[in-house]
């Protein structure tokens, strides 16, 4: 392997907007500021909203489901 071609791998602090901080190892070299983390993301907190796509399926079946082909 060649010497001195790889970037330095150092400890970095990732700070979320909610105030949570994480210690990571990275080649970036400076601290990270992120918008969401596992403490405030809706998927992990249980505040996720479910999208109902049943209306589209019903509309499709109403338009095309009644048509039958006879051979």
From Swiss-Prot:
Which UniProt keywords are given for this protein, alphabetically ordered?
Answer: Metal-binding, Ribonucleoprotein, Ribosomal protein, RNA-binding, rRNA-binding, Zinc
GO cellular component terms? Answer: ribonucleoprotein complex; ribosome
According to its UniProt entry, one GO biological process term is: translation
Q: Which GO terms describe its molecular function?
A: metal ion binding; rRNA binding; structural constituent of ribosome
- The family this protein is said to belong to: Belongs to the bacterial ribosomal protein bL31 family. Type A subfamily.
Q: How is the cofactor bound?
A: Binds 1 zinc ion per subunit.
Q: Which NCBIfam families match?
A: L31 (TIGR00105), PRK00019.1 (NF000612), PRK00528.1 (NF001809)
Enumerate the residues binding Zn(2+). 16, 18, 37, 40
This one is known as Large ribosomal subunit protein bL31
Summarizing the function annotation, the protein's role is: Binds the 23S rRNA.
* KW Ribonucleoprotein (keyword) present: yes
Subunit structure, interactors included: Part of the 50S ribosomal subunit.
Q: Which domain of life is it from?
A: Bacteria
Q: Which SUPFAM superfamilies match?
A: L28p-like
Q: Which cofactor does it need?
A: Zn(2+)
Q: Which gene encodes it?
A: rpmE
Q: Which organism is it from?
A: Marinomonas sp. (strain MWYL1)
InterPro entries this protein is in? Answer: Ribosomal_bL28/bL31-like_sf, Ribosomal_bL31, Ribosomal_bL31_A, Ribosomal_bL31_sf
Q: Name one Pfam family in it.
A: Ribosomal_L31
């Amino acid at each position: 392997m060649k010497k001195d071609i790889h970037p330095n791998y150092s400890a970095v602090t990732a700070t979320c907007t909610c105030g949570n901080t994480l210690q990571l190892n990275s080649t970036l070299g400076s601290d990270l500021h992120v918008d969401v983390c596992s403490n405030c993301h809706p998927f992990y907190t249980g505040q996720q909203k479910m999208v109902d796509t049943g209306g589209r399926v019903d509309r499709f079946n109403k338009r095309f489901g009644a048509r039958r082909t006879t051979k």
